[in-house]
C-alpha cells in the first residue's frame, strides 16, 4: 500500500518538475500566440488542441532557416573574394610594356604573362590598353593607317575604296545631284510651310504616335485583366482553403496550424494585391478611353485641316486658271487688233517697195535700151529719111487710137541669129506705163484695206443681223451655216464657263 503511494507521489513530483522546466525553458522566448497581433487568429489558435510540440517545431524551423541564411551569406562572400582575385589577375595580365619597331607596329613583354598570349593581342587593343610613356605620339597615326589598310584588304569592297576610285566628273555629278536634291527638299519644305501642309504632316505623325500609344495601352489593359483575374483566383482559393481548415478546427495537425497561419497572414496581402490590381485595371481602362478620345479628336482635326487646305489649294487653282484665261484673252486681243494689222501693213509696204524697185529697174533697163534708138530716130527725122531708115532697120510704125505712134519689128526671121530688138517707146509712153503701174499698186493696196475693213464691217453686220433676228418676234426659225454655228457655239461655251466659274467663286 505504501509503495503505490510513493510511486504516485514521485510521478507527481516528476511531472511538476518537468512542467516547471518546460515553463522555465519557454520563458526565454514569447509564445507563438504572443507573436500574433490579430485577435481573431489568436483566439482560433488558442481554441485548438496544440501544446508545446508545435512551438518546438517552429523554433527548430526558424533555427534551420537562420543557419541556411548564414551559409548563403558566407557563400556570397567567398564568391565575391574569388571575383576580386580574378579581376586583380586580369589587371596584372593587361599591364605590359610596349615599344615601337621600325614598321610602326607595337610589341611588348609582360613579366607575368606568357609571350604567346601577348602575340595574340591585337595592335589596336594594345594602343588602347597601354599607359606607358615609351610609345611616341607621332607613331600612332602611322599605326592607325596601317590598321585601316589591313582592314580594307581583309574585307574589301568598302564604300571608301569605291569613293577613292571615282573620277572627278563622277564626283562633280554626285555633288551636283546632292545639291539639287537638297534644293528640291528645301523648296518642297518651303512650299509646305507657305501652304500650311507642314503642320498637317506633324499632325499625321502625332496621330501615328497616338495609335501606337493606344495599342500599348490596350496591351497593358489585357495584362492588368490577367493579373486581376489571377489575384481574384488566388484569394478565392486561399479563402476556400481557410474555410476548409476552419471546418475541422478541433482536429488540426501542426502542418494545418502552420498552413492556417500562413493563409491568414497572406489573406490581407491578397486583399491588398487584389485592390491594387483592380485600381491598376481601372486606371488602364481610363487611360485607354482618354487615348481613344484624343486619337478620335486628332483624326477629326486632321480631316478638318485637310479640308481647309484643299479648299485653299482649290481656290488658288481657280484663281490661277482665271489668270491664265485672262492672259490668253489679252494675248488674243493683242495679236488680233495690234500684231496682225501691223504685220499686214508691213507686208503691204514691203510688197509696194519691192514692186517699186522692180519697176524702177525695168524703167532703167528700158531707158538704157531705148535712149540710143530715140537719139538715132531724132537724128534721122532731122535728115528727113525716117521711114526709109525704119524699113531698113526692120521696124514698122503703128498708130494707136490716141494718135501715138509705136515702132514694132517688121518681120522676125527665125533663122536670124540676132535677137529681136525691143520696141521703141517715147518718153510719154514710158511715163504713162509707170503711172499705170503705180495706179495698179495703189489699187491693190486699197483693195487690201477694203478687204480688212469689209471683213470687220461684215462681222459687225452679222452680229447686228443676228441680234435683230433674235429680238424680232416675227422671225420663228433661224438658218445657220457651219461657220456661224461653230462661232455661236464657241461664244456660248466661253460665256457659260465664265458665268459658272463666277457663280462657284462668289456662292461659296
UniProtKB/Swiss-Prot annotation:
| The entry's keywords | Coiled coil, Membrane, Mitochondrion, Mitochondrion inner membrane, Transit peptide, Transmembrane, Transmembrane helix
Kindly list the GO CC terms recorded for this protein.
mitochondrial inner membrane
- Name its cellular compartments: Mitochondrion inner membrane
All ranges on the Mitochondrial intermembrane side of the membrane: 340-484
List the coiled-coil residues: 49-98, 196-228, 266-301
Lineage: superkingdom:
Eukaryota
Q: Which residue intervals make up region (Disordered)?
A: 54-118, 400-429
Please list the residue ranges that the record marks as compositionally biased, kind Basic and acidic residues. 59-95, 106-118
Query: How does the entry describe its membrane topology?
Result: Multi-pass membrane protein
| InterPro entries for the chain | MDM33_fungi
Residues on the Mitochondrial matrix side? 506-508
Pfam families in the cross-refs: She9_MDM33
Compositionally skewed regions (Polar residues) per UniProt: 403-419
TM region positions:
319-339, 485-505
Subunit:
Homooligomer.
**Family per record:** Belongs to the SHE9 family.
Entry-linked PANTHER family:
SENSITIVE TO HIGH EXPRESSION PROTEIN 9, MITOCHONDRIAL
Q: What the protein does?
A: Required for the maintenance of the structure of the mitochondrial inner membrane. Involved in mitochondrial morphology. Causes growth arrest when highly overexpressed.
What's this protein's name? Sensitive to high expression protein 9 homolog, mitochondrial
Biological source species: Lodderomyces elongisporus (strain ATCC 11503 / CBS 2605 / JCM 1781 / NBRC 1676 / NRRL YB-4239) (Yeast)
